[in-house]
Amino acid sequence: MPPAKKGPATSARKGQKTRRREKKNVPHGAAHIKSTFNNTIVTITDPQGNVIAWASSGHVGFKGSRKSTPFAAQLAAENAARKAQDHGVRKVDVFVKGPGSGRETAIRSLQAAGLEVGAISDVTPQPHNGVRPPKRRRV
């Protein structure tokens, strides 16, 4: 005999409330593009730094070495821009970090998606002779 059902099936755990995502109305925000050699992450925040929308090359559906392509960065930026526009974002200041190949493509696709791009600044961290870098690759 199968065990008796205890109650309605819910996705949330017992005693835990599910938070519904409220629609923010933020006309001006900041787009943070982190472009590494392996991936590109686009995060759109409000002026205080609270995340409104984000997307990455892996989140969009690319795996492995295809995540590091400019096309993957383009799709990630379009995806994040679409989500941000649902929250009312119309203008963004862009902060680019990292040496990856998807930097310029992500900025261009933010503009193409309908966001007005204000200032573009490079915030790549530069070491003042910090830790020792990894040894050279010999291929």
Swiss-Prot record:
PANTHER family registered for this protein in UniProt = 40S RIBOSOMAL PROTEIN S14/30S RIBOSOMAL PROTEIN S11
Name of this protein: Small ribosomal subunit protein uS11
| Similarity-based family | Belongs to the universal ribosomal protein uS11 family.
Q: Where is this region: Disordered?
A: 1-33, 118-139
Q: Which InterPro entries match?
A: Ribosomal_uS11 (IPR001971), Ribosomal_uS11_bac-type (IPR019981), Ribosomal_uS11_CS (IPR018102), Ribosomal_uS11_sf (IPR036967)
Q: Which NCBIfam families match?
A: PRK05309.1, uS11_bact
GO MF terms held by the record: rRNA binding; structural constituent of ribosome
Which UniProt keywords are given for this protein, alphabetically ordered?
Ribonucleoprotein, Ribosomal protein, RNA-binding, rRNA-binding
SUPFAM superfamilies membership: Translational machinery components
Provide one Gene Ontology cellular component. Answer: cytosolic small ribosomal subunit
Q: Where is the composition biased (Basic residues)?
A: 14-23
Function according to Swiss-Prot or TrEMBL: Located on the platform of the 30S subunit, it bridges several disparate RNA helices of the 16S rRNA. Forms part of the Shine-Dalgarno cleft in the 70S ribosome.
Presence of keyword Cell inner membrane: no
- Name the Gene Ontology biological process terms: translation
Gene for this chain: rpsK
- To which species is this protein native? Mycobacterium tuberculosis (strain ATCC 25618 / H37Rv)
Q: Which Pfam families match?
A: Ribosomal_S11
Describe, as the record does, how this protein assembles with itself and its partners: Part of the 30S ribosomal subunit. Interacts with proteins S7 and S18. Binds to IF-3.
